[in-house]
Swiss-Prot record:
This is NADH-quinone oxidoreductase subunit B 2. Belongs to the complex I 20 kDa subunit family. Residues 1-14 have a biased composition (Low complexity). It comes from Streptomyces griseus subsp. griseus (strain JCM 4626 / CBS 651.72 / NBRC 13350 / KCC S-0626 / ISP 5235). Gene3D superfamilies: 3.40.50.12280. It is an enzyme of class 7 (translocase). Its cofactor is [4Fe-4S] cluster. The gene is nuoB2.
Amino acid sequence: MGLTSRPTPASRQPASPPPADPVLLPEPKRLGVLSRLAPEPMKVVLNWGRRYSLWVFNFGLACCAIEFIAASMARHDFIRLGVIPFAPGPRQADLMIVSGTVTDKMAPAVKRLYEQMPEPKYVISFGACSNCGGPYWDSYSVTKGVDQIIPVDVYVPGCPPRPEALLQGILKLQEKIARESLAERYATGATGGGPSTDALRSGLVAAPTAPGPTAPASTAPGPTAPAPTQDEERR
């Protein structure tokens, strides 16, 4: 009886776990068209400075403005979050907080003050009246939300909201600032295009008009009108 070599069983190797998906961190693009020229540490520093140095312009219109004052005092103290209250005016402010009922008569003033703020600028709608009209939504003289006049970044609900709600809204705004790109937010993008989507939605920037095809000038003389006859001249 001949000896034959028995096949050796394949060595059992533990199944390798599937490769984990790489964690993709958001690239800090916050310098618009200059983002490709600035070093990465500089982008982080500039973004950090924008998040934690928000000068606030409070546009108080009703009782929600009292809650804003309470949030800025020592008990809640939103200065510890990097928010500086009571800017001298809209030209020195980064953040406008609209608190209270916006009437149709006040709407042009809200829009004008928003236009005076320098870029980058942000808006928090504070309270039900500013969000959608609140208890006075069915009034003939009340604007149904300040977002019909200017773009809003964060909505804080409540009638009136507590100061803690405003602190939460400020944190949400800082999170939004951390992941946004100035090239996408403002008028000119990195591709050199026209106004951004936010700028067009705000109604403050006119949409660019595409140049249409122009008709070629004709060099051939057109048909001339016949000379009037003597009968037509008498008439």
